[in-house]
């Protein structure tokens, strides 16, 4: 009778680096300069990151660069359709490794993209934010919203203490 309260019917399984994970994903769009999370979208764990581009892109993003990893290679057209410039690291394939020039280009692209990866590192390491211990999509969305809010507060304090010139008031 009360089985539904003990079983999460919204969560799904996924495999990441050979490890199985059950639950939800927190997809984010963040500012490269400040590392503040601007927008987020919660999905079950089985949804691939590349399928959640459109919900994160806004009208104000048109004309800007969007840094993506190699998993988004097939979604380049969607990013262009949204009016953004996709910056995607190239990927080597079997019997067709990357050239030295491609490796150099990837290094340049990765310098900007890694700033966003720092967010996930902080959320997972310092905040234990990769775990959502609730049942249901609605509660997972709320948990991710709070995690992202707390991260932004931490980040705002860091910016205010060490780089106050990045904080601008828009009146």
Q: How should each PLM-predicted stretch be described?
A:
Residues 130, 158-171:
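A short, flexible helix-boundary coil/loop motif
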Residues 124, 154, 158:
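Hydrophobic/aromatic-lined pockets within catalytic cores
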Residues 34, 92-94, 155:
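Short loop/turn segments at secondary-structure transitions that flank enzyme active sites
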């Amino acid at each position: 009778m009360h089985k539904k309260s003990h079983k999460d019917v919204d969560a799904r399984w996924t495999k990441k680096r050979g490890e199985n994970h059950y639950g939800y994903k927190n997809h984010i769009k963040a500012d490269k300069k400040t590392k503040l999370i601007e927008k987020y979208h919660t999905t079950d764990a089985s949804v691939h990151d590349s399928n959640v581009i459109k919900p994160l892109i806004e009208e104000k993003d048109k004309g800007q660069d969007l840094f993506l990893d190699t998993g988004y290679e097939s979604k380049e057209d969607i990013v262009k359709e949204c009016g953004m410039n996709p910056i995607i690291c190239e990927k080597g394939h079997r019997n067709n490794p990357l050239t030295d020039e491609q490796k150099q280009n990837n290094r340049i692209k990765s310098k900007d993209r890694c700033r966003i990866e720092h967010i996930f590192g902080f959320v997972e390491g310092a905040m234990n934010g990769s775990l959502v211990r609730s049942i249901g999509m609605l509660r997972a969305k709320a948990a991710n919203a709070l995690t992202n809010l707390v991260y932004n507060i931490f980040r705002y304090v860091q910016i205010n203490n060490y780089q106050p010139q990045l904080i601008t008031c828009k009146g």
